[in-house]
Amino acid sequence: KENMSLAVPAIMPIDKKLLRGHIGAYGMRFHPKLHIWRPHKGIDLGGTIGDPIYATGNGTVKEVEITRSRRGYGTQIVIDHEFGYQTRYAHLDKVWVKEGDKIVRGQRIADLGNTGISTGPHLHYEVMYMGHHVNPINYINKNMSAEEFEDIISSARETTYEAD
């Protein structure tokens, strides 16, 4: 039971004091580069290139893709947290882990970047449960007060940081 509570994604992947701009919301939105409506499968957290990115739960690094391509997610990490959970951290600059690494919640795994289809430095963060995308905003309140969580919720709105 303790293993599961540490594996479930439950903290902000970036220090909330480093957030810049609004949070790009989960769900349908207008793609800022393709100019079409499509699902946004995660949230966008704006920051500065080089800001530390942290694992949101214990797990194993399933995938690391390092690229400077201006396509898709750019440089990204996928972590398997077991118990049906996976997380994706995309548009990264530097990666501090490799495939197969065991990681713990709060461990620095990467630096925020601007790779892939992106209109500014930010982290695109996804939570998947049993193979389906779920709204990450519901998984980030473990390390904040109710008031801080309400501030995050109220700032989550459509943005043009990226286009997945």
Predicted regions and their residues:
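Surface-exposed, glycine-biased beta-strand/turn segments
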Residues: 1-74, 105, 159-164
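A residue-level detector for short acidic-glycine micro-motifs
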Residues: 24, 47, 63, 91-94, ...
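Solvent-exposed coil/turn segments that connect beta secondary-structure elements
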Residues: 27, 50, 58, 66-67, ...
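Short, conserved secondary-structure segments in the cores of folded domains
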Residues: 41, 49-52, 93, 99, ...
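Short hydrophobic beta/alpha edge segments that flank linear recognition/processing sites
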Residues: 45, 75-79, 104-116
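Zn2+-dependent peptidoglycan hydrolase active-site motif and core
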Residues: 55-99, 121-122, 126
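Acidic, glycine-rich catalytic/binding loops that coordinate metals and/or anionic ligands
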Residues: 98-107, 126-164
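C-terminal appended segment following the main domain
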Residues: 111-112, 117-122, 133
